[in-house]
Amino acid sequence: PFAQTEPQFLSDAVSLARQLRSLSYVELRELWGCSERLAAENARRVRTLAEDMAADTGALTAAVMAYDGIQYQHLRASVMDERQLSWLGEHLRIASGLYGLLRPFDGVVPYRLEMQAGLAVDGARNLYQYWGGRPYDALCSGRDVDTIVNLASVEYARAMLPQHARDAPPHALGTGPQVVTCLFGD
């Protein structure tokens, strides 16, 4: 599958990319908490990240193909037929520290930015404050959503789902969709 759409929060992602670019290599490595090799590779990416995001959507990677966590490995979008990909486009949303919330075929560039990273930007102390409730609002707006199946890690669910949605028992009545959280373990 190829990238077909622009991320909804692209201008916010560009702001984050510019903030990353303003950091020194030492600050970036500390923010990422990664090896020297990964830090060097990603520091090079950061220098052109904002500009790379502005590329023609068709030249970018579809979000569903860009990540390699266990959820994406088992999803196997690369072997889906057109009907399955269409369903995926309507129902799947991807939490991202850089892009906020992505649809499967939004065009993305390679980056490193975990949701729990302590990146201060635009008056927010961290990415949780920066994104606030916007990803959840986008997830639920314009569609008839009665259930969210949450495959995200705790760190990403914290950013994407309001506290009441994360903590409510499955049978609870209230505002917003029911959230079913899947736990992954060895």
Name these PLM-found stretches:
Residues 77-186:
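Internal, well-folded beta-alpha domain core
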